[in-house]
Amino acid sequence: GVVTFDRFDVTGSLDYVKYEDWERLFESIQGESNVSIESELANQLRAIEIDITDLSAFGVELENVRTYITRKDLAWSVGLRNEMLSGIIDVPDLDSEPLKISLDYLRFLSDELGEGEELTDPLEGQDPASIAALDFKTSELMIGDEHYGMWSFDYRPIESGGQLENLAASVKGLQILEDSVVLWSVDENGKQVSSFNGQVLVPELDQALEQWGYASSIEGENFEFEADVLWAGSPAMVDLLR
């Protein structure tokens, strides 16, 4: 007889996945089809649960990732979990809408620098204007063994580069207040330049000094000041101790 079903699940494992390759494949299939492949999947698919050894997506390389994909209103919800990150990425149907990234944690390895070595910009060579618009937040940011608190921002590509709007953070006794902005641009010589403009609050000065490795010999409460800082490189090269 005829097999009938309401919805289906996909489970399994893959050695390598490059998101952009799959996107092109679906576009190619869609070009030969009289029906919307994405609409059919949205209607019939309940979930995709796949373990991926190497995942490449949006310029990021991830290893040993557990993925869980479901359908939401007007978006695909992609759950990702590995050593580096854990959280949800909502990929909207409309290209005009930003990606929405909500992470429980984001962890980067930190290599110890030898004598005379300089820190390498992890975003060197990246064109900020080519990065997709996204709304980002993480409850925990770690670099090596160092905790750098909670962060959130809305990234928007602009003609001169990119802009982190509505930036807010709580890191080692400092609070970057919402509505702060980071501008990331490329100058006429192809060199990256970043700047920060916004409000910073220090609720307990002695505690902040201690968390940043300084003697807590100065006390004070609720210090709030406006900062306007310019530095060479991408936003990743900011020196918070300045």
PLM regions: where:
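Small-residue helix/turn framework positions
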Residues: V3-S28, L45-D54, G79-T120, Q126-H147, ...
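Blade/loop signatures of beta-propeller domains
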Residues: E40-N43
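N-terminal beta-strand/beta-hairpin edge segment
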Residues: V65-T67, L74-S77, N166-L167
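Short, well-ordered loop/turn elements at secondary-structure boundaries
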Residues: K72-D73, I158
